[in-house]
Amino acid sequence: MNEVEIIDNSFLRQFETKVEGILAKIEYSSQERKVFLTKLVVPEEITKEGFKEDFIKSVLNHIQEQNLRVVPTSPQIAGFLRKNRQYKEMLPVGIRI
């Protein structure tokens, strides 16, 4: 995995990174120690192989470091979690993907 440098823009409620000046983001909302990942936006101009996966992993690692739970409401992020079961302990009790 290539670690992606992310910024938590809490004002806009999104995790951000830039690749060659192009903004990619994961929008979120938070409630009671849970982070709801609602939308992944990676412009087509970002063609770097494996970027989406590395970006999602970096965001999940950031959330994990803060001992928060994650609720993936974005289909792309839910699909990533299905394939990467090492993050399943981050899901709140009762949430299955």
Annotated model-derived regions:
Residues 30-38:
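A conserved beta-turn-beta hairpin within the catalytic core of GNAT-like acetyltransferases
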Residues 62-97:
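C-terminal structural segments of small proteins and small subunits
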Residues 47-61:
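Conserved acetyl-CoA-binding loop-helix of GNAT-fold acetyltransferases
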Residues 9-11, 31:
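Structural motif
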Residues 22-26, 35:
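Glycine-rich phosphate/pyrophosphate-binding loop shared by adenosine-nucleotide-utilizing enzymes
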Residues 13-23:
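Conserved beta-hairpin
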Residues 41-47:
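A short, internal acetyl-CoA/4′-phosphopantetheine-binding micro-motif in the GNAT/acyltransferase core
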